Curated annotation (Swiss-Prot):
Listed PANTHER family: SNRNP CORE PROTEIN FAMILY MEMBER, U6 SNRNA-ASSOCIATED SM-LIKE PROTEIN LSM2
Example of a GO biological process term: tRNA processing
Entry keyword annotation includes Cytoplasm: yes
Record GO terms (molecular function): RNA binding
Taxonomic lineage of the native organism: Eukaryota, Fungi, Dikarya, Ascomycota, Saccharomycotina
Additional observations: Present with 2210 molecules/cell in log phase SD medium.
Main function: Component of LSm protein complexes, which are involved in RNA processing and may function in a chaperone-like manner. Component of the cytoplasmic LSM1-LSM7 complex which is involved in mRNA degradation by activating the decapping step. Together with PAT1, the LSM1-LSM7 complex binds to osmotic stress-activated mRNAs to attenuate the osmotic stress response, probably by limiting ribosome access to the mRNA and consequently translation. Component of the nuclear LSM2-LSM8 complex, which is involved in spliceosome assembly.
Annotated effect of mutating residue 37 to A: Strongly reduces affinity for poly-U RNA ends
Keywords assigned by UniProt, alphabetized: Cytoplasm, mRNA processing, mRNA splicing, Nucleus, Ribonucleoprotein, RNA-binding, rRNA processing, Spliceosome, tRNA processing
Domain Sm: 2-76
Gene coding for it: LSM2
Descriptive protein name: LSM complex subunit LSM2
Subunit description: Component of the heptameric LSM1-LSM7 complex that forms a seven-membered ring structure with a donut shape. The LSm subunits are arranged in the order LSM1, LSM2, LSM3, LSM6, LSM5, LSM7 and LSM4. Except for LSM1, where a C-terminal helix crosses the ring structure to form additional interactions with LSM3 and LSM6, each subunit interacts only with its two neighboring subunits. The LSM1-LSM7 complex interacts with PAT1; within the complex PAT1 has direct interactions with LSM2 and LSM3. The LSM1-LSM7 complex interacts with XRN1.
Amino acid sequence: MLFFSFFKTLVDQEVVVELKNDIEIKGTLQSVDQFLNLKLDNISCTDEKKYPHLGSVRNIFIRGSTVRYVYLNKNMVDTNLLQDATRREVMTERK
């Protein structure tokens, strides 16, 4: 649940999602669920010449299992808080 909690803190932030089929989609994260499915608004494809059919799409739902990577702005992540949360989760799993 750590990643779910982490991504919920990124709602209304701009992210770039790289899919397993090499498509990169930039947009505003609107929601995330426990399966790490993502809903993005105001999207744009980073390579619109290669994927022209995405040019007219503004909102998209991305299944979590198709995501390869999510690019974040460095200042969007509090690394100390993330490290502490990771340690707490490991400690609760050991009990």
